[in-house]
Amino acid sequence: MARALLGTKVGMTQIWSGRRVVPVTAVAVTTNVVSQVKAPEKDGYSRLQIATGAIDPRRVNRPRKGHFAKAGLTPRRFIREVDSEGSLGDEFGPEIFQEGQLVDVVGKSKGKGFSGTMKRHNFQGVSATHGSHRNHRKPGSVGASSTPSRVFKGTRMAGRLGSSRVTVHNLRLVKIDSENGLLLVEGAVPGSSGSPVIIRDAVKGVPIVS
């Protein structure tokens, strides 16, 4: 099973790695704790629920307070489920990873609001001239005529863009800064600054050529 850690995105910077400058995303990581173990017999599937982040107890609602009290833990800010192994109450941090390994990062992308087909689906658009009149950014036809007399499900149209779960595969873990509780991951990571992200072992495991 893949090892996984829950942290928060800090932002992007760049560091020197050998003779080249590497763009990295800093992810703040504090101690993670297993707050629940999902079992097939009771829940129908097998997962670990991990939690992290400090939160003012006055801001925790009663159901969540009861959930953590049942596990014998103080409330945490973020909760996520991961496909990993462990026992209730287990604590772990950045030490589960090694510098240079490949990881997958899961986060929620920034919301862009209602967007047209050119921005949302990279449609080409309509010609700027040659008789085109106020159709420049329209999607064009969305289906045939009397057959089938409907628009097929899944047809790409305008709609809300972003604010969805995104996984970026095979990013290199450049540096582990245990003193400051930071993981530096090469490249961009989904989400805005302060949003929770899951860092896990790369499931595809493609070797990286340095």
UniProtKB/Swiss-Prot annotation:
The gene is rplC. GO terms for molecular function: rRNA binding; structural constituent of ribosome. The keyword Ribonucleoprotein applies. One of its GO terms (cellular component) is cytosolic large ribosomal subunit. It holds the Pfam family Ribosomal_L3. It comes from Tropheryma whipplei (strain Twist). Residues 126-150 are annotated as: Disordered. Keywords: Ribonucleoprotein, Ribosomal protein, RNA-binding, rRNA-binding. InterPro entries: Ribosomal_uL3, Ribosomal_uL3_bac/org-type, Ribosomal_uL3_CS, Transl_B-barrel_sf. Belongs to the universal ribosomal protein uL3 family. Transmembrane segments: none annotated. Part of the 50S ribosomal subunit. Forms a cluster with proteins L14 and L19. This is Large ribosomal subunit protein uL3. GO terms for biological process: translation. One of the primary rRNA binding proteins, it binds directly near the 3'-end of the 23S rRNA, where it nucleates assembly of the 50S subunit.
